[in-house]
Amino acid sequence: MSSLFKSTWNTRWLPSGDYRYIRTDCPRNITEEEIGFLIEHNILTVVDLREEVEYVKRPCPLENDNRFKYLHMPVSGGDVYPVTYEETMKAYDTMMDDNLLNIVDTIMNSATGVIYFCAAGKDRTGVVSAVILKKLGVDEKTILDDYMISKDNLMVRLEKIKQEHPNQTIRAIIPHPDYVKNILKKI
C-alpha cells in the first residue's frame, strides 16, 4: 500500500469503517491539495504525538492554519530510540499509560475527523491506532495488518535510518507484530 498523500510516506485511513481517522507520519510538506482533501472529508482536528524537541525542530504547517484545531499531545516515552527488539518491546510498554488513554479519548471524542501523527507514523501512531481500533471492536488481525502496512510504506526510509545509526538493529526499527500484540493484551 502506498501513502494516501504524495507529500508523506505513511498516510492512510484507519480501518475503522467510518473514515474519521487518518494516521500518518509528520505532514510537514503537506500540499494545498492535500489540505483540501482533509477539509473536504471533515478531518479538521490535528493531533501531534511528537515530543517537544521534534515538534520544535520540524514544525507541522497545519499548526498555524486556522481551519484546523491543532493539539500537541506527546506520547510518553516517544523520545526513546531502542537498539534491540527487547528494548523496543519495553518502549512500547512505556507508551501504554494514562496519558496515552487520554490521547485516544481525545481523538475518539473529537467533533470532527482527526489526523494524528508522530515522526514516522509507525510506533507512537501505531500504538494509538491499535488502541483506537481495539476500543472500536475491530478484530486483532485487522489491527495487526494495519500496523504492518508501515513496514512496507517505510522500508526505504528505515534502511536509511539503519545506515545512519549502525548500532541499531534493523529488527528494532522495523514494525513487528509482537510489539502491537503485546499492547493489545494490556487493553
Locations of the language-model features?
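Cys-dependent protein tyrosine phosphatase-like superfamily
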Residues: 1-115, 127-187
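Ser/Thr-glycine-rich phosphate-binding loops at phosphate-binding pockets of nucleotides
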Residues: 120, 124-125
